[in-house]
From Swiss-Prot:
GTPase that associates with the 50S ribosomal subunit and may have a role during protein synthesis or ribosome biogenesis. GO terms for cellular component: cytoplasm. GTP binds at residues 190-197, 215-219, 236-239, 304-307, 333-335. This is GTPase HflX. Belongs to the TRAFAC class OBG-HflX-like GTPase superfamily. HflX GTPase family. Keywords: Cytoplasm, GTP-binding, Magnesium, Metal-binding, Nucleotide-binding. Its main location: cytoplasm. It comes from Nitrosopumilus maritimus (strain SCM1). It is found in: Cytoplasm. PROSITE patterns: G_HFLX. Residues 184-355 form the Hflx-type G domain. One of its GO terms (molecular function) is metal ion binding. Mg(2+) binds at T197, T217. Its cofactor is Mg(2+).
Length: 371
């Protein structure tokens, strides 16, 4: 595993997530520098911190330096020139993870589109640096003229988009076929590493790769299950993360758009998180689902890892998420299978009602934890 120095914000949840991203990308964090501000003009950090970083970098000699914020090309170049190391900002790090995780032809195309969008946003500045005789440390472009460079990126983006459009049309045909056959559909959604794939495996009897690492799932997998003796199709989808830029969501649109067409979305929530992390992740999930046009009345909330908490802790967190009056949540354990049967029954009852607004069954801690 390659070594990395991590520069991140001085907040525990942010540090943990940044380290998780590094681990998922195959980097072992050997030193962490925590700062209140990471958006200073020249380096992102102050000159004093840069001097300290130079000393540490010379001593540790890491393979990369990970900067947990979005860097301008000039900032990336300035850091690389001062530290003589490859610099990865937050978005580049996520793209590294995506590239290593992509297994299907479609997910590889989606990652390529996201990479090209990342490159396009930085094209002008990189051309300017190149014309000045300065060579950025990451994605260097040599002496390309700006129009040649732009046209090259646009051409590659159009090629990838064309292939993704074909995949999207094929996906639409599959959706229409499932609808004609009368299949109801369920999709799992939620923050990355919340336990979606583990729950998917428990509900379907599958043995998909599951991990506590971030972004284990990049491509959609669909399987058939029976609920109340009726056939359903259930899909696992890519996880969300805070500060995921719009262009990355757009790149995975053909995969994520499944959420807009499914009958029920199971929003998987890691109820074992601290209240601060829980609120942040839940807010991020709901914002992303809203951007994808997913209606709240089609959502069911699976409060995963509930076997690790006392009833009172779960109730407190349900109040924190403003789900007390919502009738469509249930504490589960994807690992032990606890209440997974009840989750299926809840989904069946909702779909049988044909109108989620009229759904009246109350599911709560008292009703489910005794089973």
């Amino acid at each position: 595993m390659k070594s990395a120095i991590l520069i991140t914000y001085d907040k525990e949840d942010v540090i943990n997530e940044a380290k998780g991203l590094c681990d998922a990308a195959g980097f072992q964090v050997v030193h962490t520098i925590k700062q209140k501000f990471l958006k200073r003009p020249k380096y992102g950090i102050s000159g004093g911190i840069l001097e300290r970083l130079e000393e540490i970098s010379e001593k540790i000699r890491p393979d990369v330096i990970v900067f947990d914020e979005v860097l301008k090309p000039s900032q990336n170049y300035n850091l690389a020139a001062a530290l003589h190391r490859e610099i990865l900002d937050r978005e580049a790090l996520i793209l590294e993870i995506f590239e290593s995780r992509a297994s299907s032809a479609e997910s590889k195309l989606q990652v390529k589109l996201a990479q090209l969008r990342y490159e396009m946003a930085r094209a002008k500045e990189k051309v300017r640096l190149s014309s000045m005789g300065e060579q950025p440390g990451f994605m260097g472009i040599g002496k390309f003229e700006v129009d040649v460079y732009y046209n090259d990126i646009k051409h590659r983006m159009n090629t990838v988009r064309s292939k993704l459009e074909k995949a999207g049309k094929q996906r639409e045909l599959h959706r229409q076929g499932r609808k004609r056959m009368g299949f109801k559909t369920i999709s799992l959604a939620g923050y990355t590493s919340a336990g979606k794939t583990t729950l998917f495996n428990m509900m379907t009897g599958e043995t998909r790769d599951q991990s506590s690492e971030l972004f284990t799932t990049l491509s959609t997998t669909t399987r058939r299950v029976s609920i109340n003796q009726e056939p359903f199709l259930i899909s696992d989808t890519v996880g969300f993360i805070s500060k995921l830029p719009a262009y990355m969501i757009d790149a995975f649109k053909s995969t994520l758009e499944e959420l807009g067409h499914t009958d029920i979305i199971i929003v998987v929530i890691d109820i074992g998180d601290s209240i601060f992390e829980l609120k942040k992740k839940f807010s991020s999930c709901m914002r992303t689902l809203s951007e994808l046009g997913v209606e709240k009345d089609r959502m069911v909330y699976a409060l995963n890892k509930s076997d690790l908490l006392e009833h009172s802790e779960i109730e407190e967190k349900i109040e924190t998420l403003n789900l007390v009056d919502n009738k469509k949540w249930i504490p589960v354990s994807a690992k032990t299978g606890k209440n997974v049967k009840q989750l299926k029954e809840l989904i069946g009852d909702i779909l049988e009602s044909h109108n989620s607004h009229k759904f009246g069954k109350k599911i709560g801690v008292e009703e489910t934890f005794g089973n």
